[in-house]
Regions:
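Glycine- and acidic-rich phosphate- and metal-coordinating loops
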Residues: 141-145
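An alpha-helical repeat/solenoid feature that recognizes helix-turn-helix modules
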Residues: 1-51, 56-100, 108-134, 146-171
Length: 171
């Protein structure tokens, strides 16, 4: 495993391993509430969590659930996790790792048409000011084929993505 275990983000369960997804959710929330929180604590906590996410970035950009390398093998990034990580790092949109990961996300979507991946990606592209109409069309096509298997999370995120709901995630 190649990661810095000293960098802490957030975990699914208290006192356990820091994962990219819950860390990204927490970062968006904390960044949106930072005006109401102690600035010293927010700056330190956000900075460490951002460093943790960047530390876990896969070779070539993007993220998976928590590790970039295991047993000497580079792991693949996932589009949904990549989009969510980029959403949490949107205030660093011009930084090279973010730009590399945006390009990687575009490539990942060529082979992945899941509702969850498309919805998170559209929200991400919209937050970064990138064109998303092609992906909205792809999401609609995917929904017509699968109805996203009736899963609430991708359906809800797709509705947000199709209606410019990215503002909910703006930090």
């Amino acid at each position: 495993v190649k990661l810095n275990p000293l960098l802490k983000g957030w975990s699914w369960t208290a006192g356990t391993f820091s994962w990219v997804e819950p860390t990204a959710y927490a970062l968006v929330a904390v960044k949106q509430l930072k005006a109401r929180l102690s600035q010293d604590q927010v700056i330190a906590r956000v900075g460490e969590a951002e460093r943790m996410i960047y530390d876990r970035m896969c070779v070539g950009g993007g993220w998976n659930y928590g590790n970039s390398t295991v047993l000497g093998e580079n792991l693949w990034p996932y589009p949904d996790t990549t989009a969510l990580a980029l959403i949490s790092l949107q205030d660093h949109r011009a930084d090279p790792p973010n730009q590399l990961s945006l390009k990687a996300l575009q490539k990942m979507l060529a082979d992945n048409h899941s509702g969850l991946a498309l919805a998170w990606s559209i929200l991400c592209f919209d937050l970064y000011g990138n064109e998303s109409s092609h992906w909205i069309d792809q999401m609609e096509k995917s929904y017509l084929e699968t109805e996203f298997l009736g899963e609430t999370k991708p359906i809800a995120l797709a509705l947000l993505a199709a209606s410019h709901g990215e503002q909910i995630f703006r930090v």
